[in-house]
């Protein structure tokens, strides 16, 4: 086709001009990616004002707020704000706080059982009460008339319990070893102390012709040693022993326990003792280093709470004590003293470790039980697959409540408010938690001063009356669940407190005749006979079934009535109910379930039948008030974080047989943090010893690898700018470590389960 001379000119415009993309070379791939994005952004060019009219119109959403394309002019604030001051962006680096609702997204209980209404219940016959038969008196068991009269007149004990009847007659009749097994609260302490005192009183009956004084006195030597696992139990045994020895003043008893000065203990040993109550560790120390401690005349050795002795790791100490007693035993010149030593082992359970302790200390021991004639019971226990069998007192009314993690704190508060609503209904309550840090946190929450409605109107005198944060303040008014007609005193107790503070706190709680609550760890769960304890609350379930038995054994003692409540969370913890049922002779028919919402309604809403709907609002307001109180006080916020951390670490220490019921992987840490008045994400709760979240660990690792802006990197990978401040950084780090170490020694709440 021939060229006709026509020339075509097409106008494409500036927007459709094809531009060559530059090829980027060199640098890292991050730098090339950033440069490519910048080039693409520049190639688009500025947006023309008329382009918005040519864009397709999107149908309007009635719920969408239209925003103008042109930015309106700012107006000056007239509400007393900062005006034109530029806003600081420092808050963007702070951890975001999320205030979740108490009653949303809570897991539902898996096992839905019918909640039994409270009504007239058939009274169960007490299984640990003194015998009613008039023939079973202390005199008929072989005790001297003076000791029996002392029990009747001074101690007001008219008849022995079943275990006391069986053990006193056996230990007075024979000199062989014995294993005493009885349920908690049945009087095991007197079961071995009465034969011990009676045998030593029998040795002192012959008198010399010259002076007329008993042959046995404090210089005659040490005849008996009683070992107990905890200092509190040693103190209690010593108090009971001193009350018995008031009828035999020439017999002297003493204690050697940890936490006291060894110099004072050596002075007591130098003066002379006939009966010694001790902890295994301190006794082993004295046997090794104290020459004045003469054990050649020791003829009675008692191991109280044998299962706890083994759990606390005293096996080596006890084995060494037994070997030293055997090696140092010598024939005595005192007439009537046994030729060989008698060892008595006491325990409420028959576990494998108790049997191992018996192999170490006992030889041909007699098994003493409260009901040896019950052959059906013995046969049934022999066919059980478990290595231990524990029994709950029949008169103890036990219940459990399935409470969501977020509702734990408010539910406990509501239950205590309802318990102490009327004066005289409940005198004393013990609340068991898993760790010492949790004890300190809940003590501060329940004893905090209520916030003023108007801080400006509060006088200076009212501000000075606020309770200071004291590391050893263990007694305070319980403002969270007290009322004007029934004030309640709150106590706290755990193993990290100094020994003198623990002793004084426990004595004050025992002597207090007004309504009081003791919040504690398992340090108060073994052997302590605290009078008038009507209720036991297991806020955190025990680490084993045996520990649960000893916890609830603080109530319903020696025939008295008692109640116990266990808090469980929805999910795998509900299977723990089967463990609770095993402790009953009737298969758990007496075990009842309490609805968590009913507890909240009764605690925060008053009468349930009134149909009030504001109980959930009151519970939410109380929870938010505690959270604000925690945020406004850095020392309490740090305490809450430590309690949260220690609780999680303690949660993982359940025994292997029950670990499937307390699976730490199924814990909702965010919901659990709500129970400690925390609004932070669990990964943001940075306290010493708590592992950071995965994202924060990656960020810190990358930040350490990258040099700061304007700094050069050395050949060894360190930043040049770091060398200038290395000395100051090391000084600050060492000072911080020193403060943390001092705080650990002063506060003493670093452990999560001390007994």
From Swiss-Prot:
PROSITE patterns: HELICASE_ATP_BIND_1, HELICASE_CTER, Q_MOTIF
Biased composition, class Basic and acidic residues, residue ranges: 107-125, 692-717
UniProt entry keywords in alphabetical sequence: ATP-binding, Helicase, Hydrolase, Nucleotide-binding, Nucleus, Ribosome biogenesis, RNA-binding, rRNA processing
Residue ranges, compositional bias (Low complexity): 718-735
Main location: nucleus
GO molecular function: ATP binding; ATP hydrolysis activity; RNA binding; RNA helicase activity
Composition skew (Acidic residues), residue ranges: 454-463
Region: Disordered, residue numbers: 28-128, 452-481, 685-755
Family statement: Belongs to the DEAD box helicase family. DDX31/DBP7 subfamily.
Record-given protein name: ATP-dependent RNA helicase dbp7
Organism whose genome encodes this protein: Aspergillus clavatus (strain ATCC 1007 / CBS 513.65 / DSM 816 / NCTC 3887 / NRRL 1 / QM 1276 / 107)
Lineage: Eukaryota, Fungi, Dikarya, Ascomycota, Pezizomycotina
Gene name as annotated: dbp7
């Amino acid at each position: 086709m021939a060229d006709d001379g026509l020339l075509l000119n097409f106008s494409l415009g500036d927007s459709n001009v094809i531009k060559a993309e530059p090829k980027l070379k060199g640098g890292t791939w991050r730098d090339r990616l950033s440069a490519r994005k910048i080039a693409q952004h520049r190639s688009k060019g500025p947006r023309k004002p008329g382009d918005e009219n040519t864009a397709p119109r999107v149908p309007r959403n009635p719920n969408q707020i239209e925003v103008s394309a042109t930015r309106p002019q700012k107006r000056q604030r007239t509400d007393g704000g900062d005006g034109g001051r530029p806003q600081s962006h420092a808050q963007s680096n702070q951890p975001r706080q999320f205030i979740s609702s108490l009653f949303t997204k809570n897991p539902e209980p898996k096992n839905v059982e019918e909640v039994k209404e409270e009504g007239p219940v058939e009274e169960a016959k007490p299984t640990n009460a003194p015998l009613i038969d008039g023939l079973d008196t202390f005199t008929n068991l072989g005790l001297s008339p003076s000791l029996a009269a002392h029990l009747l007149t001074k101690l007001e004990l008219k008849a022995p319990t079943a275990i006391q009847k069986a053990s006193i007659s056996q230990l007075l009749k024979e000199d062989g070893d014995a294993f005493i097994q009885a349920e908690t609260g049945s009087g095991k302490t007197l079961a071995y102390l009465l034969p011990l005192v009676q045998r030593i009183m029998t040795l002192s009956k012959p008198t010399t012709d010259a002076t007329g004084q008993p042959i046995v006195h404090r210089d005659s030597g040490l005849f008996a040693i009683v070992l107990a696992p905890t200092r509190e139990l040693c103190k209690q045994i010593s108090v009971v022993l001193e009350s018995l020895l008031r009828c035999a003043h020439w017999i002297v008893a003493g204690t050697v326990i940890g936490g006291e000065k060894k110099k004072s203990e050596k002075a007591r040993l130098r003066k002379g003792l006939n009966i010694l109550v001790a902890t295994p560790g301190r006794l082993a120390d004295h046997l090794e280093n104290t020459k004045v401690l003469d054990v050649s005349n020791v003829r009675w050795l008692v191991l109280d709470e044998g299962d706890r002795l083994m759990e606390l790791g005293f096996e080596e100490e006890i084995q060494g004590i037994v070997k030293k007693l055997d090696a140092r035993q010598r024939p005595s010149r005192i007439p009537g003293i046994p030729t060989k030593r008698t060892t008595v082992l006491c325990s409420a359970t028959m576990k494998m470790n108790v049997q191992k302790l018996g192999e170490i200390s006992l030889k041909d021991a007699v098994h003493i039980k409260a009901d040896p004639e019950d052959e059906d019971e013995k046969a049934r226990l022999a066919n059980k697959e478990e290595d231990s069998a524990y029994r709950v007192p029949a008169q103890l009314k036990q219940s459990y409540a399935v409470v969501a993690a977020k509702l734990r704190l408010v539910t406990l508060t509501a239950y205590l408010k309802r318990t102490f609503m009327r004066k005289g209904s409940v005198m004393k309550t013990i609340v068991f938690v898993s760790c010492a840090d949790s004890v300190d946190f809940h003590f501060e929450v329940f004893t905090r001063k209520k916030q003023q409605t108007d801080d400006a109107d509060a006088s200076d005198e009212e501000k000075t009356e606020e309770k200071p944060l004291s590391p050893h303040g263990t007694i305070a008014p319980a403002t969270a669940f007290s009322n004007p007609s029934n004030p309640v005193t709150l106590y706290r107790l755990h193993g990290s407190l100094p020994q003198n503070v623990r002793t004084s706190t426990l004595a004050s709680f025992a002597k207090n005749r007004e309504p009081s609550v003791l919040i504690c760890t398992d340090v108060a769960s073994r052997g302590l006979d605290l009078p008038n304890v009507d209720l036991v609350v297991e806020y955190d379930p025990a680490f084993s079934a045996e520990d649960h038995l000893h916890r609830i054994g603080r109530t319903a003692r020696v025939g008295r009535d008692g109640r116990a409540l266990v808090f469980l969370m929805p999910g795998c913890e509900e299977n723990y109910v089967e463990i609770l049922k095993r402790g009953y002779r009737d298969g758990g028919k007496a075990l009842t379930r309490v609805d968590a919402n009913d507890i909240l309604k009764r605690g925060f809403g008053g009468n349930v039948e009134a149909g009030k709907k504001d109980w959930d609002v009151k519970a939410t307001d109380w929870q938010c008030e505690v959270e604000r109180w925690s945020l406004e006080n850095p020392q309490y916020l740090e305490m809450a974080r430590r309690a949260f951390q220690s609780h999680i670490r303690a949660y993982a220490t359940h025994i292997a047989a029950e670990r499937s019921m307390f699976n730490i992987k199924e814990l909702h840490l965010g919901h659990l943090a709500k129970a400690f008045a925390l609004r932070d994400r669990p990964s943001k709760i940075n306290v010493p010893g708590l592992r950071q979240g995965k994202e924060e660990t990656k960020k810190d690792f990358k930040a350490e690898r990258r040099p700061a802006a304007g700094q050069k990197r050395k050949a060894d990978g360190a930043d040049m700018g770091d060398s200038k401040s290395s000395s100051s950084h090391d000084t600050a780090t060492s000072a911080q470590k020193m403060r943390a170490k001092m705080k650990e020694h002063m506060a003493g709440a670093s452990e999560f389960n001390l007994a």
